[in-house]
């Protein structure tokens, strides 16, 4: 068999201040560390960086693109999604939050993740709606016609620990997939994301 291709280097950081090379696993731990889990219930047992072209279906379709995950989730699940903000706070002038996306009107979780956002890069109406924590971030940016683009950073495979099993309603020690991405607003890196999908059938 042909060996799986090695992951390509990540071209820039998912960083609030500058573009620089990073280790995706370090960035993963930095984002997950914004809201640490208890030591006896870690978020994941293992995580590895996987080349985009080695990502299996259906996760490749779900994750390997430069679009908002809100749109991908709604397309895949054939319904709108709601956001549930589990925790949020400000740190060093940045807005941080831990979230889940749910199939609209249900308790079915489809995505878990972390957001690190420099709100200075969007207008006051956009900031206000984001801080209300009622509408998914991607939908707000689209509805306000914010000039933006999504840059995919890295694809990650996870073995769920008790934390991820709880948040995604999945078995512990089972695998799922996620990604690191950056959203640029008005030409500047504004939003760092860790987005992990619930297991797909």
Stretches found by the model and what they are:
Residues 1-2, 106:
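Generic alpha-helix initiation/capping and coil-helix boundary signal
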Residues 2-9:
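Compositionally biased, low-complexity flexible segments
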Residues 11-96, 100-177, 184-201:
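N-terminal domain-onset segments
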